[in-house]
């Protein structure tokens, strides 16, 4: 049985195929395909059954003209969420080239200059001093808890900013 806090490292091998049945059971087929992968097995077939328990997570990250808006699965602790030090960004991109792979290049450190927590405490709007089109914006969240005092299951989020929205 599983709740949504099952991570790829909890599975036997790298996930390759998923199948959801009518009763909500998920079958996960995995292989490392001769490469390094999460898990300790070269192949796996696992059955997961949903327990109905949703963890405290970042549900969505949306680009705004001056930053990002985060939606959470539960209300946040407004006091911690309002602190600038809770939110740390870095941004970077990769070299487009014909050979395989690329190092991260053009690292930048956007700073959060303003935090707005919605009345229902499920949405947090972060204003940044800079955003770079074409960059991956990597967010790390330090010490944020839900209003029910639960920690974030995953304290990072990534957004590839293909364009900066207008308006709002």
Language-model regions: role of each:
Residues 20-23:
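Residue-level detector of Asp-centered blade-edge/turn motifs that repeat once per structural unit
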Residues 71-114, 139-146, 155-159:
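Short, surface-exposed alpha-helix to beta-strand junction/turn motifs within ectodomains of secreted
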Residues 1-8:
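Short, small-residue-biased leader/transition segments that mark boundaries at the very start
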Residues 12-14, 41:
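Beta-rich catalytic cores
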Residues 52-60, 77, 95, 132, ...:
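Acidic, Ser/Thr/Gly/Pro-rich low-complexity segments and short DxT(G/T)-type signature motifs
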Residues 25-29:
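Conserved beta-propeller blade signature
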């Amino acid at each position: 049985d599983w709740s949504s806090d099952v991570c790829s490292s909890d599975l036997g091998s790298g996930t390759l195929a998923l199948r959801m049945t009518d009763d909500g059971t998920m079958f996960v087929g995995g292989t490392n395909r001769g490469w390094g992968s999460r898990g300790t097995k070269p192949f796996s077939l696992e059955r997961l059954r949903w327990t109905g328990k949703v963890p405290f997570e970042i549900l969505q990250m949306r680009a705004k003209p001056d930053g990002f808006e985060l939606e959470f699965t539960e209300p946040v602790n407004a006091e911690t969420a309002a602190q600038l030090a809770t939110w740390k960004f870095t941004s970077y991109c990769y070299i487009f080239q014909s050979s395989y792979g690329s190092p991260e290049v053009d690292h930048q450190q956007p700073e959060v200059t303003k935090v707005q927590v919605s009345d229902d405490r499920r949405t947090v709007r972060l204003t940044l001093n800079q955003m770079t089109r074409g960059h991956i914006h990597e967010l790390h969240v330090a010490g944020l808890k839900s209003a029910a005092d639960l920690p974030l299951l995953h304290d990072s989020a990534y957004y590839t900013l293909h364009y900066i929205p207008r308006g709002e």
